[in-house]
Curated annotation (Swiss-Prot):
This is Thiamine-phosphate synthase. InterPro entries: Aldolase_TIM (IPR013785), ThiamineP_synth_sf (IPR036206), ThiamineP_synth_TenI (IPR022998), TMP_synthase (IPR034291). One of its GO terms (cellular component) is cytoplasm. Condenses 4-methyl-5-(beta-hydroxyethyl)thiazole monophosphate (THZ-P) and 2-methyl-4-amino-5-hydroxymethyl pyrimidine pyrophosphate (HMP-PP) to form thiamine monophosphate (TMP). Its cofactor is Mg(2+). 2-[(2R,5Z)-2-carboxy-4-methylthiazol-5(2H)-ylidene]ethyl phosphate binds at residues 143-145, 175, 195-196. It comes from Geobacillus thermodenitrificans (strain NG80-2). Belongs to the thiamine-phosphate synthase family. 4-amino-2-methyl-5-(diphosphooxymethyl)pyrimidine binds at residues 44-48, 79, 117, 146.
Amino acid sequence: MARITSEEMKERLAVYFIMGSQNSERPAEDVLKEALDGGVTLFQFREKGSAALEGEEKEALARQLQRLCRTYGVPFIVNDDVELAIAIDADGVHVGQDDEDARRVREKIGDKILGVSAHNVEEARAAIEAGADYIGVGPIYPTRSKDDANEAQGPGILRHLREQGITIPIVAIGGITADNTRAVIEAGADGVSVISAIASAPEPKAAAAALATAVREANLR
């Protein structure tokens, strides 16, 4: 499998949905199917937290959601768990600054998609050197979806990264909604990444569609 190109990666990052069983009171498969119907372009399985599944249950859910993504032709990314990603032949892995070293992850996963969380120019450059295909930058706005989230930085961090010569595809995360998507894209992000904006929405399909429309309209300006 050849490495994904930068242009392909940018397109995939448009509406990046992150979810685990702990993020919704409804069955994860139902929420994901509706989100995919609404226009999600990339999915990350993030099973973390005190209520998260483990072991065989975690793998079973991962495979279930992966099958759904394959039906829609949407890449399936695993958060942090490199061994699980390899075991189920996921399309890629995303790691944070406190997870396994990105360079080692790249060696393990070969040409699969590698995403790395970055909060500043130094971390962004390190991710690029490690072989990342994209970086996740945030939190842009305050968020309650992650217990360990850093302080919100605002869209200005995206603009700063671009001004410092960071050209790698960037997805913005943290408190993203359809209403603030335009500001994020105009500041330099290629796409938006959300958890609660879709997982907690009464209608995940409509929520995903609203984000997709917002990204598309922002890119036309």
